[in-house]
């Protein structure tokens, strides 16, 4: 990107999904940040940035706290998109209704759209109203299972200096179905049909990243056949996703607990795709069982 360009990230999403942590993360990365920016003021603010030699990496939180949000957001985005000197991305933070309710109960704050005080009603209305904006977003992050530290790392991985947000990147992740589907997944594959290392006593406490577990999972004939078909399905469609302008494609592979089979498969897939593509590998639930045991 040209140094004359403004690199703008608009941070939005569900109330309670982590926008405060997100904007603090951008500040730590060296972005000029503003929280609770009225949409109508964004174009004028960007004009001022263009006229200076100040930091041209900008992150703005634009959300439901602005009373005129829905009247102004579309015209604001049109104005930004028509400016050739601005490269911009929308980061949409989401979480399940149950998790958002839990967070509101913990903080004892009211939801901006809960006129009668019913948090869940406010969340459902907000989700409905934000649905079009979410569909426009280049980056959707589900924070349901993320700690603040994990969210900071996610943002750092995607937006730190030197990363190319405009490039196409593949996120390969493993997860456990018992802990819920990842909301930000584009493609989901189920490997629960494979033999489960959990029932091998010597493998139970290990993960799919351990060599003996990995070999156990991948050596079965069913694994070899499925993995071959998985590659044959995914690899040919990657250029099409890139051509359509998608910046991040999230491929999620799940097993029961997210500790053995899905971890091994996700690791294998990430290594295969990394020969030709930019790939990040993550394992959402691989240590969750151990954490549960330790807390009990």
Curated annotation (Swiss-Prot):
Q: Which residues form a coiled coil?
A: none
Q: Which family does it belong to?
A: Belongs to the RapZ-like family.
- What's one GO MF term for it? GTP binding
InterPro entries, per the entry: P-loop_NTPase, RapZ-like, RapZ-like_N, RapZ_C
Q: Can you say what this protein is called?
A: Nucleotide-binding protein spyM18_0713
Q: Does the keyword GTP-binding apply?
A: yes
Organism name: Streptococcus pyogenes serotype M18 (strain MGAS8232)
Biological role stated in the UniProt entry = Displays ATPase and GTPase activities.
The record ties this protein, via Pfam families, to:
PapZ_C, RapZ-like_N
So where does ATP get bound? 13-20
**Residues at which GTP binds:** 63-66
Q: Which UniProt keywords apply?
A: ATP-binding, GTP-binding, Nucleotide-binding
- Highest taxon of the lineage: Bacteria
